[in-house]
């Protein structure tokens, strides 16, 4: 499998950033995590892959699938990093990062999930139920694939400058990708988060405070994975892009994790 990967920085602990979105988008990981490039100047090295069918990575004949993507993140990236890496996943990429973490827990220094697409874990919350019904209507009742992509982006709070869709052809491809996208079941996510907690992988869950469904989901994910919650004020689905606050929170979290690891090895 050919995966295009952007690298920022040449030294320091490794951070792997996994983006979300739907196949057909010409925006890759470097677009979704553009504001994190400055971390390379602060002692971190970042690996930012384009998932299959996104950005510069060719499609692999499969839909967006957290399990399949998690496998190559674990086996092609984590497996080749002797010191392991911190994993960061946004939206659907959060499900990918989670799948990778449970596949190779010993190689994961920490796991950070930004507005993870795991609403099935909070389906009892009224805001999440309404949001879920809205997304189902968008998926099945949109008059065209292009309209599906437009409506989804509006509902999920994806800014045009980040979400791509610069042409009708790209919109159509993304709308088709959204229809085929495979979201993990609640049972799968529960099991994986339990595995993360059992393995003692430090977990940080970040949301932007702009949508109650993402807040309820973030709370549920953090509870199941024995993680820490952080809310970084954002008007949309990308709290990692609105200011440097996310970078500061993430760097502090990862540095504390690494310090504890170093201390444990010393003893």
Predicted regions and their residues:
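Flexible "cap/lid" loop of the alpha/beta hydrolase fold
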Residues: 102, 106-140
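Gly/Ala-rich beta-loop-alpha elbow adjacent to hydrolase catalytic centers
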Residues: 89-93, 97
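Catalytic active-site module of serine/aspartate enzymes centered on a nucleophile-bearing elbow/loop
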Residues: 225-267
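Conserved serine/cysteine hydrolase catalytic core
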Residues: 167, 176-225, 230-239
């Amino acid at each position: 499998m050919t995966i295009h990967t952007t690298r920022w920085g040449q030294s320091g602990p490794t951070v792997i950033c996994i983006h979300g979105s739907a196949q057909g988008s010409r925006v890759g990981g470097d677009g979704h995590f553009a504001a994190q490039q400055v971390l390379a100047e602060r002692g971190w090295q970042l690996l930012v892959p384009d998932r299959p069918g996104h950005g510069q990575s060719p499609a692999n004949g499969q839909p967006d699938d957290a399990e399949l993507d998690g496998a190559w993140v674990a086996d092609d990236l984590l497996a080749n990093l002797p010191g392991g890496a911190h994993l960061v996943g946004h939206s659907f990429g959060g499900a990918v990062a989670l799948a990778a973490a449970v596949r190779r827990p010993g190689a994961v220094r920490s796991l950070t999930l930004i507005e993870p697409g795991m609403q099935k874990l909070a389906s009892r919350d009224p805001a999440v139920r309404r949001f879920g019904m809205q997304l189902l209507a968008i998926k099945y009742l949109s008059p065209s694939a292009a309209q599906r992509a437009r409506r989804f982006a509006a509902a999920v709070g994806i800014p045009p400058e980040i979400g791509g869709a610069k042409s009708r052809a790209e919109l159509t491809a993304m709308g088709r990708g959204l229809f085929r996208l495979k979201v993990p079941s609640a049972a799968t996510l529960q099991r994986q988060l339990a595995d993360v907690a059992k393995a003692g992988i430090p977990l940080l869950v970040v949301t932007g405070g702009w949508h109650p469904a993402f807040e309820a989901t973030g709370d549920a994910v953090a509870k199941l994975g024995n993680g820490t919650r952080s809310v970084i004020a954002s008007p949309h689905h990308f709290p990692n892009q609105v200011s440097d606050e996310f970078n500061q929170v993430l760097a502090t979290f990862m540095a504390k994790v690494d310090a504890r690891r170093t201390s444990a090895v010393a003893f």
